[in-house]
Amino acid sequence: ASSSAEGIYILGSLNVNVVFNTVNLVSTNTNNIGLHLSGGGAIHLLNNNIAVKGGDALYVHSGLSIDQSDFNNFYNANGDVGYWEDEVKTLSDLIAASGKDSNSISEPPYFYNDTSYQSAQVALNNNGSPVSGITTDIEGETRDASNPDIGADEFSPTSQDAGLYALVVPEMPFAAGSLPVK
């Protein structure tokens, strides 16, 4: 059995800016927490990309003062978004419970691999909000001054020049060997 993990844990702290972070917890342990906040106040959560495959992407205890939370991606591949003084199943539930995160999303980040902070998720690109004093990403690359990316990495997604809409021919079941497709 895998042990539980917490990406970011803040306990009893004041005046904390949690901005432009990426957390990717790949274990399916149901006790994992991507971003855990307990006690304290004047906390600002902006432009974070928090993804888990088990547990909660976000866990906020009661009595905590969060001044701002927005432009985040809270994603759980196998369950609820998290907990905000009570279980929140969806991003809409989180917005209703917190009164915050109206510009946040809950999208799979499409990391290049389990140990990568680099994402291929178009929804993260240019959908953050500028934060005064933060002009570069984790790699030292310049952040977009008006519309930075959500998460630790500023990136430009690859453009799609083609995609599969439908497979018309050959019909299933496929015969063995090489077949032309239409």
Where are the model-predicted features located?
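Short glycine/acidic-rich loop motifs that flank beta-strands on beta-rich extracellular proteins
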Residues: A1-G7, S27-G34, G54-H61, N78-D86, ...
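Right-handed parallel beta-helix
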Residues: A1-S2, G7-Y9, L14-S27, A42-K53, ...
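Cysteine-rich, disulfide-stabilized extracellular repeat modules
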Residues: S4, N31, E107, Q160-G163
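Short, T/G/N/S-enriched strand-turn elements that build extracellular solenoid repeat scaffolds
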Residues: L11-G12, G39, V60-G63
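Acidic glycine-/aspartate-rich tracts in secreted/extracellular proteins
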Residues: N29, G54-G55, N73-V81, K100-D101, ...
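Extracellular beta-strand/loop-rich repeat segments of large surface/secreted proteins
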Residues: N31-I33, G39-A42
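C-terminal accessory segments
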Residues: L91-E154
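Extracellular/luminal regions of secreted and cell-surface proteins that mediate adhesion/ECM remodeling
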Residues: P157-K182
